[in-house]
Regions:
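Active-site-adjacent loop and "lid" segments of alpha/beta metabolic enzymes
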Residues: 67-76, 112-119, 175-179, 203-228, ...
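Alpha-helix-loop-beta-strand connector modules within alpha/beta enzyme cores
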Residues: 42-44, 48-49, 68-94, 129-135, ...
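A cross-domain feature marking catalytic cores of carbohydrate-active enzymes
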Residues: 26, 55-59, 95-97, 117, ...
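Catalytic alpha/beta core domains of metabolic enzymes, predominantly
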Residues: 133, 137-239
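Catalytic beta/alpha-barrel core
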Residues: 73-74, 88-102, 111-124, 135-146, ...
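Glycine-rich, proline-tolerant flexible connector loops at the mouths of alpha/beta enzymes
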Residues: 22-35, 53-75, 240-249
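Structural preference for beta-strand elements that scaffold enzyme active sites
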Residues: 19-23, 52-56, 92-94, 111-112, ...
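N-terminal amphipathic alpha-helix/helix-capping segment at the start of soluble metabolic enzymes
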Residues: 1-22, 271-277
Length: 277
């Protein structure tokens, strides 16, 4: 794996292992215990497998289909929990923002600022994120061609920040499905920035009549293995001790006790591919 600017991210370990990196954690901060327990378990696994690990969890979910859907436990409370994760476990943390004001606020708590897929073309949001000086992870919109992501990245660069990641999270395939075009990974890597594959949101089943997004978590391994096969730099995966009881995106997340076996297989696949290359 090319180090890019990743070596500049505080507490991002195992970069010399040759492995992909992962961004992993529960969809949203539900409480301190679930957040801490999940971070601790993922750290244990990634240290064993020598995988660079960035903890991910949203401090608030702004994009909900129904007005009564769970959005969070309170911004300040959630951000303080994320900061505690970074300090206690000595790992970098990423969370997403939804407007310019949140860029400045979240940058005081996390190492990486994430731009949601639906907001990937919002110029003022990208500029605000860039000006924090934090790494900016831009998720490719389900409606955006991979070649067009160079322009989103350039907005960050032209704002004085060259620390950009791009994330593939699927493309609309009709009204109620997404599909991963693995050519997107290759196309976005042409920008020179690290490219991540979101293996959980790529399996969403949107626009359900219930108003709650569905998913196909049984295919997470398939999507992830294909991503490793084409040479993706990082894997984004949401995981939870009990997805059935999760307050957001439970239908998409991988059960935490399945994570080690999945990552073990991905590392083995990565090593095999590197031998041939």
């Amino acid at each position: 794996m090319k180090n890019f600017f990743l070596s500049q991210i505080e507490n991002l370990h195992n970069l010399d292992s040759g492995n992909f990196f992962i961004m992993a954690g529960p969809c949203v901060v539900e409480n301190e215990k679930i957040t801490f327990d999940t971070a601790e378990k993922i750290l244990e696994i990634t240290e064993k497998l020598k995988i660079p690990f960035i903890f991910k969890s949203s401090f608030r979910k702004a994009n909900r289909q129904k007005i009564d859907s769970f959005t969070g436990i309170g911004d300040e409370k959630a951000l303080k929990i994320l900061r505690s994760v970074a300090e206690i476990y000595e790992i970098p943390v990423v969370t997403d923002i939804h407007n310019q004001e949140e860029a400045c606020i979240t940058s005081q708590y996390v190492d990486i600022i994430q731009i949601p897929a639906f907001l990937c073309r919002q110029t003022e949001l990208l500029v605000a994120a860039a000006k924090t000086g934090r790494v900016v992870n831009i998720k490719k919109g389900q409606f955006v061609a991979p070649e067009s992501m160079q322009f989103a990245a350039q907005k960050v660069v032209d704002s004085g920040n060259k620390k950009v990641m791009l994330t593939e999270r699927g493309t609309m395939f009709g009204y109620q499905d997404l599909i991963v075009d693995y050519r997107s990974i290759i196309e976005m890597q042409k920008t020179g920035f690290p490219v991540v594959l979101d293996v959980t949101h790529s399996l969403q089943i949107p626009n359900q009549q219930s108003g709650v997004t569905g998913g196909k978590p049984d295919l997470i391994g398939t999507i992830a293995r294909a991503g490793i096969a084409v040479g993706v730099d990082g894997i984004f995966i949401e995981t939870h001790p009990n997805p059935a009881e999760a307050k957001s995106d439970g239908a998409n997340m991988l059960k935490l006790d399945l994570l080690e076996s999945l990552l073990t297989r991905l590392v083995q696949l990565r090593q095999t591919i590197l031998k041939f290359n």
